[in-house]
Amino acid sequence: MKLSPTFVFTILSLSLNFAATAVAAESCELTEADRAANANLSFDDFDQRGTTPTTSRKLGERECYAEAARASEHYLLFGPLLDQHQRTVVTWHMGQYLALNGDEETAARILAATRRQPVNADDTLDWNTYVIGTWAFLTKDRNLLRTASQKLSSAPGVGNTMNARVLQGLEACFEKPYRDAYGTTACMPAKP
């Protein structure tokens, strides 16, 4: 069976178009249309699940940290009105993206704004100590980081244990930038 040149050209063009679309989906570009689409997403779809390639979650997963921070900022301004917990989470992630992008000074100021009241009466997560510990790492206050890490290490609950390990990792790699210290295997303590 002989294929016509037109058929081959059409197939080749479609293949290249699909490849270009896949590359664009994996790029760090964040257009006005992307920001507008993000603004229509629920908190879960934007921040937790990252249902489209241009949500802050998906941009962050691709290490597009500056764009992830911009997407978060735009979402906070133009997305749905969020409750206190949701605003805190999006703001926290925006600060993390800035820190991962190397802007630890701005990140520290943003993360400082994420302290909060307990989510509910049964909330045992000592979020504020985690915030203070992370802020201490970003501002290079070793003593405050150590105090926060020790406090979380003795607090009950899985969330506190996880966050204590993160702070211990930041302590172990205190001289490194956040991008190299946060959650990396080389910095994290062994699981008990």
Provide a role label for each language-model segment.
Residues 58, 97-98, 135-138:
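Residue-level signature for tetratricopeptide repeat
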Residues 25-91, 149-192:
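N-terminal alpha-helical interaction modules that lie
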